[in-house]
Amino acid sequence: MAILINEKTRVLVQGITGRTGAFGTRAMLEYGTKVVAGVTPGRRGESVWGIPVFNTVKEAIEEVGPIDLSVTFVPAPQVKDAVIEALEAGIKNVVVPAERVPLHDILVMVSKAKAMNARIIGPGSLGLISPGKASAGWIGGARELIEESFRPGKRRSHL
């Protein structure tokens, strides 16, 4: 059962044009994740792995439609602004892989997420995976390795 991410989850990548953002996006795409847009200020009109890049989260949503989850591949000092931008645009799930995010920034993000009935996974999170369906964040690598490490569970009729 996929709870936070599945094959239909529409994912946005903040920081998609950076080295880590492009690498993480490629891993997610190879696993089957439905990455529909990326955001890097000042880079509108570009594309990464065929994914359109926009200047803001709001602009991306206006162009591609609703987004279910954002992954913030941005440096720790930029995490707070990226997360708040995603939350204010209406995204309810935000994955934050960055480490060393200042504690005050974390408190601000958590308070904002609670007020907006949203969820932050991280900071310092490897991300999410629904085996055989989709992944978000750093849970990536060679598809064969992921499939060996993360397998769908067996359905039990008594549950």
Give a label for each model feature:
Residues 62-69, 73, 77-100:
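Rossmann-fold NAD(P) dinucleotide-binding segment
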Residues 21:
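N-terminal Rossmann-fold NAD(P) dinucleotide-binding loop
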